[in-house]
Swiss-Prot record:
Annotated protein name in UniProt: Translation initiation factor IF-1, chloroplastic
Organism in which the protein naturally occurs: Nuphar advena
InterPro entries named in the record: NA-bd_OB-fold, RNA-binding_domain_S1_IF1, S1_domain, TIF_IF1
Name of encoding gene: infA
Subunit structure: Component of the 30S ribosomal translation pre-initiation complex which assembles on the 30S ribosome in the order IF-2 and IF-3, IF-1 and N-formylmethionyl-tRNA(fMet); mRNA recruitment can occur at any time during PIC assembly.
HAMAP family in UniProt: IF_1
GO function term, MF aspect, one: ribosome binding
UniProt entry keywords in alphabetical sequence: Chloroplast, Initiation factor, Plastid, Protein biosynthesis, RNA-binding, rRNA-binding
Chief localization: plastid
Length: 77
């Protein structure tokens, strides 16, 4: 059976090398996030200040996979 993942929303606080980011979740936890392969293939740019959805394992809540970048409400995209 497949492991259940918890999906949270958060804010990118710092960019690290190799597609890694520090993400502050809405519940104030700090998680080390890496970019999923689909986002990497689509050349989606993630910058500090962006809101993202992150998938966190229930066994290791200190790291997770960034699966979606949420659109900013004030941008013209």
């Amino acid at each position: 059976m497949k492991e259940q993942k918890l999906i949270h929303e958060g804010l990118i606080t710092e960019s690290l090398p190799n597609g890694m980011f520090w993400v502050r979740l809405d519940n104030e936890d700090l998680v080390l996030g890496y970019v999923s392969g689909r986002i990497r293939r689509s050349f989606i740019r993630i910058l500090p200040g962006d809101r993202v959805k992150i998938e966190v394992s229930r066994y290791d809540s200190t790291r997770g996979r960034i699966i979606y970048r949420l659109r900013n409400k004030d941008s013209n995209d």
